[in-house]
Curated annotation (Swiss-Prot):
Database matches in PANTHER family: GANGLIOSIDE INDUCED DIFFERENTIATION ASSOCIATED PROTEIN 2-RELATED (PTHR11106), MACRO DOMAIN-CONTAINING PROTEIN (PTHR11106:SF27)
NCBIfam families recorded: PRK00431.1-2, PRK00431.1-6
Macro domain span: 1-175
Cleaved signal peptide residues: none
One term of GO molecular function: O-acetyl-ADP-ribose deacetylase activity
Protein name: Macro domain-containing protein XAC3343
Family classification: Belongs to the MacroD-type family.
Any Pfam family hit: Macro
Amino acid sequence: MRIEVWQGDITELDVDVIVNAANESLLGGGGVDGAIHRAAGPRLLEACEALPQVRPGVRCPTGEIRITDGFDLKARHIFHTVGPVWRDGRHNEPEQLANCYWQSLKLAEQMMLHSIAFPAISCGIYGYPLHQAARIAVTETRDWQRSHKVPKHIVLVAYNEATYKAYQQALATQETAAA
């Protein structure tokens, strides 16, 4: 079992599932959400449009997950999750972000998926501070692997050097604390 930090395009990974940092409409957007929609092809948008709305314009509330096929991606599945918009850290943002990771891992386990790739959820337009988000991502994935067998391979995908360094620093800090 391992956690890997990888810098590059999440849509290129050959894993069982990639996690999409989506918006509540699931209709595509900017950042990683737009990249995943473009790479997966038009059938992804059709699949997202077919998902029921829980209230007008909302198919996936913050912290929840919806599943689609991977379509034109190497990944077989896409887990769409909506991370919190950063306000000031006092409106349950850390708990909501942690829940995005935990619920994705729980669903991967239920589906017996062995590999999962996460983007830096909420770190783009949603404005979550990168180092805090990286610490949450590492904590949640490490805690999961301590008590679960699946998924065996977790990839934290960095879209740039700053994100890569933040993940590496969070991993190193946890390794030092665990020693």
